[in-house]
Amino acid sequence: MSKQRIYEYAKELNLKSKEIIDELKSMNIEVSNHMQALEDDQIKALDKKFKKEQKNDNKQSTQNNHQKSNNQNQNKGQQKDNKKNQQQNNKGNKGNKKNNRNNKKNNKNNKPQNQPAAPKEIPSKVTYQEGITVGEFADKLNVESSEIIKKLFLLGIVANINQSLNQETIELIADDYGVEVEEEVVINEEDLSIYFEDEKDDPEAIERPAVVTIMGHVDHGKTTLLDSIRHTKVTAGEAGGITQHIGAYQIENDGKKITFLDTPGHAAFTTMRARGAQVTDITILVVAADDGVMPQTIEAINHAKEAEVPIIVAVNKIDKPTSNPDRVMQELTEYGLIPEDWGGETIFVPLSALSGDGIDDLLEMIGLVAEVQELKANPKNRAVGTVIEAELDKSRGPSASLLVQNGTLNVGDAIVVGNTYGRIRAMVNDLGQRIKMAGPSTPVEITGINDVPQAGDRFVVFSDEKQARRIGESRHEASIVQQRQESKNVSLDNLFEQMKQGEMKDLNVIIKGDVQGSVEALAASLMKIDVEGVNVRIIHTAVGAINESDVTLANASNGIIIGFNVRPDSGAKRAAEAENVDMRLHRVIYNVIEEIESAMKGLLDPEFEEQVIGQAEVRQTFKVSKVGTIAGCYVTEGKITRNAGVRIIRDGIVQYEGELDTLKRFKDDAKEVAKGYECGITIENYNDLKEGDVIEAFEMVEIKR
């Protein structure tokens, strides 16, 4: 147990440290300052002195207060006496005033002692959000920020009170205090996908109609099949038949409803999936019995498989003399669609959309597949779903066809649809009837939104119109920012596409190199490239590192930058990222020519892309026999990793490119060294390192095309 210091003892008794020091000196005890530790016998001697005095002071204060009370009562009784008595009373009062002054003085000395606040207990569990700072984490642990900073320093992390902590560091500190930590998941209310949940586990969920999409090759009978189902199952007497085209419709078969999406082919299907909309439960693949598998048939199979949607094959046109259903089955087995009769799991239904034969069998199979899938939704929830179609009507304004996927949609609901918002003014079903509510898997057309959304956008109903407006406006602003950030500049990756669209006549190129001879040779070689439809135009050449003005010129002229044996400086890197300017860095002229020529011919398909992960500045060099040159470095950007490739840059010009030999922190090998730390580096097969050189670390990252 640590000994008590003089200032701590004084604080405990609400006294000044000087009083304790004086008393100790009177006891012939040598005292240097208030930080001196007290021995047990010294504390006992001080306790006798000061605690006894405090008891006496408290006792005297109580007596004086009692006397004051008696004097006040006596004064009240004597007010009825004569003048003489009053004068005597006045004399007495003078005495009382004196006593009162003494009492006040005593009371002043005997104020309640300001005991130090008890330290807050460290909680057993704390929650934190990503990006929590040292100060915020210290508050949650009920400790001083300086304590956390000390612990971080011992872990080799130099931090201040406003520094953000990562998950690993937070867990290490919490473990040191014996505290359990849990990261809070911050829900972004603008992300509409969080409102879409699987309703199978909801106890209040009930069965919902299946949503079916019909796909297939051109002229194989998709539209005819849709019309046949529609006319078979929907009577013309229902509100004048189908009077409203909203991109979907519902039919009833054996007391169960089925929703069909009347989408224009695979493009819309793909667009919806690209926007995250998974609306289809079952895919009907229409294949003509007299034609077999065609390119769009394969495309449809791939779409359905990627979406993990069950496929029912409708073999159409069986009434034709040239039909051969067995050939269709045989061809489809090559794509993993094996009929049940042949030991597979795919349902095949032969039918004729023109005559109506087999339509009932198809609907029955749809019902069976839907039953196996256990499609459920909770109609008591607020509605969520997907946009099927949208348009701007001259008389009604923006309108959207929606498919309700869960919950119930009502007229008057506050709604966010994609990047638009509003309150539903009117709602029309697939029969053209005005309705007030629509349950799960029901297609409806609504009006009342402020703008036209896109097909595949999601919609969510909110209880508060202000909230819907705020989220809708915020999503709209975010989409504008995203559109502005999207690349409009030419790059070698999109060059061929722009050439095909007739947008590119000249490819503007800026060349920066290490020496003038290389720059001139490269410019001459590029000018010789001859590809029909586009010309190479050199708009600027210079010697030296790529700088910010080069990026500005490339952005203004819609050009690309080629660096030959040079690197961009930090300002140029930031500007290129902000303006989406394409920079290509090479060390071999042939590679430059080949890359640009391939891009112009539409053959460019790079699999890997270089990613710079960090930079270190050489502060000092040491020559060691049998080892070579060791560079004492300071990491200025990112991090240096043991397995990264490196290049040595001197005055913006690449001197050498190779690999790290060793990476050390003090005497220990390190896997990586982060920004702000010093390290020792040796380069494999390279010893010509000098102070001021920049070591750039990079790695090759596989990119998707």
UniProtKB/Swiss-Prot annotation:
Region (G1): 216-223
Primary location class: cytoplasm
Region described as G3: 262-265
ATP-binding keyword on record: no
Any one GO molecular-function label of the UniProt entry: GTP binding
Low complexity compositional bias, start-end: 59-77
Residue ranges of the region described as G5: 352-354
Any one of the GO CC terms: cytosol
Keywords recorded for this protein, A-Z: Cytoplasm, GTP-binding, Initiation factor, Nucleotide-binding, Protein biosynthesis
Subcellular locations according to the entry: Cytoplasm
Free-text function comment from the UniProt entry: One of the essential components for the initiation of protein synthesis. Protects formylmethionyl-tRNA from spontaneous hydrolysis and promotes its binding to the 30S ribosomal subunits. Also involved in the hydrolysis of GTP during the formation of the 70S ribosomal complex.
UniProt cross-references to HAMAP family, sorted A to Z: IF_2_B
Binding site for GTP: 216-223, 262-266, 316-319
Region (Disordered), start-end ranges: 40-124
Designated name of the protein: Translation initiation factor IF-2
Entry similarity comment: Belongs to the TRAFAC class translation factor GTPase superfamily. Classic translation factor GTPase family. IF-2 subfamily.
Lineage top rank: taxon: Bacteria
Keyword Nuclease: no
CDD domains with a match to the protein in the record: IF2_eIF5B (cd01887), IF2_mtIF2_II (cd03702), mtIF2_IVc (cd03692)
Region (G4): 316-319
G2, as annotated region: 241-245
SUPFAM superfamilies documented for this protein: Initiation factor IF2/eIF5b, domain 3 (SSF52156), P-loop containing nucleoside triphosphate hydrolases (SSF52540), Translation proteins (SSF50447)
Domain tr-type G per the UniProt entry, residue ranges: 207-376
Residue ranges with Basic residues bias: 94-108
Cystine bridges: none
